Amino acid sequence: MREIVHIQGGQCGNQIGAKFWEVVSDEHGIDPTGTYHGDSDLQLERINVYFNEATGGRYVPRAILMDLEPGTMDSVRSGPYGQIFRPDNFVFGQTGAGNNWAKGHYTEGAELIDSVLDVVRKEAESCDCLQGFQVCHSLGGGTGSGMGTLLISKIREEYPDRMMLTFSVVPSPKVSDTVVEPYNATLSVHQLVENADECMVLDNEALYDICFRTLKLTTPTFGDLNHLISAVMSGITCCLRFPGQLNADLRKLAVNLIPFPRLHFFMVGFTPLTSRGSQQYRALTVPELTQQMWDAKNMMCAADPRHGRYLTASALFRGRMSTKEVDEQMLNVQNKNSSYFVEWIPNNVKSSVCDIPPKGLKMSATFIGNSTAIQEMFKRVSEQFTAMFRRKAFLHWYTGEGMDEMEFTEAESNMNDLVSEYQQYQDASAEEEGEFEGEEEEA
């Protein structure tokens, strides 16, 4: 029916993706060999959103795995669900991008991109009615950011009317893996603003905080972080995969969340998050879920929604619950915290309800918010970018791959424009508009 083709690129993307397929396979009752061992017809009814049925009743993920070095893919292949993927869908080079966006976008990545696109076409052709693509990648490295954005722009050319959803891990404020992260991230955002439809912004630091504070894990691993991300990824598409009372799909989400085409960077959250010890002491109710869902500590990227205002938001509930109660709770949030919502978009929270909760929970909720506070994150990256670019530090790595300084300047100003657009709508109020119109008439 409404298929989604999943693409994961680079080390970060492949690790998130691997975790995501564990979660989705588990939800649909698929074991690591691709065989169905579920207990409900609902698991199979729309399994083809993410899986292809192959010969002998095997289910194969519609996933494309790409990287410029074989390392991460080998570990995916030898991981718990490594044997479920179609072997031809592993596309990798041998050189690596060395955290260099230019290598991923212009040199090494460009050599590999055609073989990736062949696999993309093959997957898209086997779809009955393709809904869109979802891409997992990070913006700080070389492959996920450089080659990831190259692939997104190529897919955009070939499938202009399909949704393009990304799960992008941005560099964290305090934890840095690479010195050139600000360069790679800025060049990537420059691409994502133009070519993606919806970007779910994630960052490791916010995810670590959730693991420490909420889940009370003393030594969180990347596996724990990726598990959080995959909970959100599964929540976003659950309406496509399971029956529900109020459905949402990628396009409905976009229509409800994006008031202006460039402002499509979202904060995401998932509830309930409880530490293992205190799980059994919590009753799960719609008000409880709603409360945790809107909590700033619950956001998976390091921007504080209380520093901005929500343009729009979307809540995707899962489980048996009354839609009336969901609507009441959502209205309640908007009425009590009206200063955090822009008043010139009335009823700007969309909710949907899917009947089937995730494994092991009675009910859950996924939150997607389009908040002007996300500019904090862009601002932070932009400041680090400018600090280095002013001195032209590390630039030779990029110009050596044939890039021009001009491209850096363009990316920088595009990012700064984005920040000021968010600021402009944060400050806008319903009344102001009238005054301007009046002045124009007089003139």
From Swiss-Prot:
Cross-referenced InterPro entries: Beta-tubulin_BS, Beta_tubulin, Tub_FtsZ_C, Tubulin, Tubulin/FtsZ-like_C, Tubulin/FtsZ_2-layer-sand-dom, Tubulin/FtsZ_GTPase_sf, Tubulin_C
GO molecular function, one term: GTPase activity
Cofactor(s) listed in the protein's UniProt record: Mg(2+)
Cell compartment(s), UniProt: Cytoplasm, Cytoskeleton
Any one of the GO CC terms: cytoplasm
Ranges of compositional bias, category Acidic residues: 429-443
Annotated region described as Disordered, given as residue ranges: 424-443
GO biological process terms held by the UniProt record: microtubule-based process
Chain positions recorded as GTP binding sites: 11, 69, 138, 142-144, 204, 226
Protein origin, superkingdom: Eukaryota
Family: Belongs to the tubulin family.
Assembly: Dimer of alpha and beta chains. A typical microtubule is a hollow water-filled tube with an outer diameter of 25 nm and an inner diameter of 15 nM. Alpha-beta heterodimers associate head-to-tail to form protofilaments running lengthwise along the microtubule wall with the beta-tubulin subunit facing the microtubule plus end conferring a structural polarity. Microtubules usually have 13 protofilaments but different protofilament numbers can be found in some organisms and specialized cells.
Extra information: The 2 beta-tubulin genes of Chlamydomonas (beta-1 and beta-2) encode the same protein.
Record's protein name: Tubulin beta-1/beta-2 chain
